[in-house]
A protein has these predicted regions:
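A compositional/structural signature marking long, glycine- and acidic/polar-rich segments
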Residues: 128, 140-141
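Generic hydrophobic/aromatic pocket-lining and core-packing "Φ" positions
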Residues: 36-39
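Glycine-rich Rossmann-fold phosphate-binding loop(s) that bind the pyrophosphate
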Residues: 29-33
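Conserved N-terminal/central alpha/beta ligand/cofactor-binding core
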Residues: 1-7, 15-16, 21-23, 41, ...
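Second-shell loop/turn segments in exported
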Residues: 27, 75-76, 92-98, 153, ...
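Flavin (FAD/FMN)-binding glycine-rich loop and adjacent Rossmann-like elements that form
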Residues: 2-7, 17, 61, 122-123, ...
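Anionic group-transfer/hydrolysis microenvironments
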Residues: 27, 55, 161
Length: 301
């Protein structure tokens, strides 16, 4: 791997050391809802903030790539200000697996652009950290398209990656999966610890085409019949898979299988099911190409 890395750097004309993107008071890695909120909260307190995100849009699961609704209890009890930031950038419409415009990606980007103390780095994925003793001093991130790298220095870092990536790269203890019942006394925990997690959802929806439409009819590798097929017009978070696989190492495999199930089920509804009148004029309007992850590493410190 090191030889390949050196070859790639030389072929692309990249320097041996990633250039410094800047020095910041806080570097936030991951621009989902948590990362956006952390970055702007710090910026409004006077911090110079770098916000790094490995996708071309921000919002994480609430972006148009994944399309999970933004919701939760806010402004309740003694926590009257809890949720105030999210109200500033959150989309007006709710719901899962809705048209892309419902998730208002541009509204989120515009909201961040108005914060003069936040610099957003889109399409950069964190790949390494440097430490001084037990303290992280910099994060290196690589552009997912060009391969160019940049280094970000700061006294403070916020891991909002969802996978605990920065903590993991820094050598922090973490857990993944379920603890044994004996550890915390949870009544429904397994007798023995295992690696099972919540899965990842590949959401989708169909639209009325106004006329009969076709869909490729061949064996997708997942067999459906009238008893086990899902007779639905859309799929939300319940179209979840990968519970017994590694949500990091196997994530593309999990996503691919989720898509396979969507296409296999839709093919059955369109081509094999006898009573399929409600599907004849419908076509797939959208299928997520980025799965919505529900669980990953839990950093222990």
């Amino acid at each position: 791997m090191k030889q390949l890395e050196a070859f790639r750097r030389k072929a692309l004309g990249f320097p041996d050391e990633a250039p410094l993107a800047g020095q910041y008071d806080l570097v936030v890695v991951g621009a989902g809802i948590a990362g956006m909120s952390a970055a702007v909260s710090a910026a409004r307190l006077g911090c110079k903030v770098a916000l790094i995100n490995d996708r071309p849009v921000i919002g994480g699961n609430n972006s148009s790539e994944i399309r999970v609704h933004l919701g939760g209890r806010i402004e309740e009890g003694v926590y009257k200000e809890l949720g105030g930031l999210q109200k500033e950038f959150g989309p007006e419409k709710g719901g899962n697996a809705q048209p892309a415009e419902n998730y208002e990606d541009q509204k989120k980007l515009d909201w961040l652009a108005n914060e003069k103390n936040v610099t957003l780095f889109l399409n950069y994925r964190a790949i390494g950290v440097t430490k001084d003793g037990n303290k992280i001093t910099s994060v290196t991130a690589r552009h997912i398209e060009s391969g160019k790298e940049q280094k970000f220095e700061a006294p403070l870092f916020s891991d909002c990656t969802g996978d605990g990536t920065i903590g993991y790269l820094a050598g922090a203890d973490f857990r993944m999966g379920r603890e044994a019942k004996s550890e915390f006394g949870e009544s429904i925990a397994p007798e023995k610890a295992d690696k099972m997690t919540m899965g990842a959802s590949v959401q989708w929806y169909s639209v009325d085409n106004g006329r009969s439409s076709s869909f490729p009819d061949f064996s997708y590798g997942v067999e459906f019949n009238d008893k086990n097929c899902e007779k639905v017009l859309m799929g939300e978070w319940t179209w979840e898979t990968g519970m017994n696989l590694d949500q990091i190492k196997d994530f593309e495999r999990i996503r691919d299988y989720g898509m396979l199930v969507v296409y296999s089920n839709w093919s059955y509804l369109k081509n094999q099911m006898k009573e399929n009148t409600q599907y004849r004029n419908r076509k797939l309007g959208w299928v997520a190409y980025v799965a919505g992850k529900r669980e990953s590493r839990r950093l222990m410190g």
